[in-house]
Structure formats: C-alpha cells, structure tokens
Amino acid sequence: SAILIGSRFLLPSGQTYNGLMHINFESEGGRQAEVYRLPITGGENFLYLVEPGVYRIAPTRSVFGFYQEMMNVVIDGRQYRLPFPRDLLRQPPYTIKASKIVAMGILEARVLPALPGRQPQLRIRLDDGVSARRKVVQDTIRDMMDPNLSPETRESTIAWSRALQDSLMNILSEEQKRTTYKPAP
C-alpha cells in the first residue's frame, strides 16, 4: 500500500521547483503507532510506501517525540517558520488498504506578497480536489514511463502500475458522479 502526494511552491513571481517541507503521516495507537516523516520537495510527485491502516496528517516530531508546533518551509533558499496549518490537521483520516494507492492531492505552499518593511506570509494548503488528485496520478503514470529512468527505478514503478490505474479509475468515477437531472424543489 502507498500514498501519492504532489507538491507546489508558489512565489509572487510564479512557481519554483526549489523548496522543501516536512509533514508526518501517523496512525492511531500511541507507542505502537506507525509514524512516517514525509519530506516534500518542489514540483514533484511522491509515492510513499506505508503499512495498511488509518492515518492522519500531523506535525513533525522532535528528537524526543514531542510535536513541533512550528513548521519549517524552505523556498528558494529562504526559510519560513509558521504554525502548523489547522487545515491540514482537520483533514479526514485516510484509510490505506493493502496493495492500494491513495492519491492525497497537491500540498501547496504559497508566499503572499508583503508590504515594504514587512515579512512575507506563507500559506499552506492541501489541494485534494478531484482534478488535483487526477493530475497527480496521471503525472506519476507519465513519469514512470520516462525512458531516461534507470532500469531499477522503472521496474519498481511498473510494479505499482496496476494500483495506479485502479486509483485513477476511482478518481474518474468520482468525477462522473454528477447528477444529470435537476432535483425537484
């Protein structure tokens, strides 16, 4: 089982591919909980292998296991510190089933323009709409067929091709579940 997440780093001047942030992906269970620290760099899609279970997005932890309230984001060589976004904490739990891929969406870090003499603000959100999840899966499928990849990398990604295809079909079926009639008042 795996999760698929994309990233986008936006400056006032446009998108950059030079960025880094970390989030945790954690299950319930106290000491026995599965905890994955996910590094996310700019403009890429990441396929992270996880154990089956129910997981939530969480702030990263310190060396001693305490949650870090502040999130560090590096964009174009500049470091930003901000409180971990509540929108990410409020995301519903993700149920990860064996040999399935869950497309989470695109994690977006946007630097807002600042007035002269003030620090720019940073907003982080997870774009988990159907179109964003579809784009992440389609881009991953396209990237895994790149002839410039090493044979070992291509073999490992092709092993996930069936799960990626199933994930894409599920997303497309969500997109087509629109009502074709006007409901009665």
Region annotations inferred by a language model:
Residues 1-36, 62-185:
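Primarily secretory-pathway and cell-envelope proteins
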Residues 39, 47-49, 93-95:
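Generic structural detector for well-ordered beta-strands
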Residues 42-56, 60-65:
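Short Pro-Gly-centered beta-turn/loop motif in secreted/extracellular proteins
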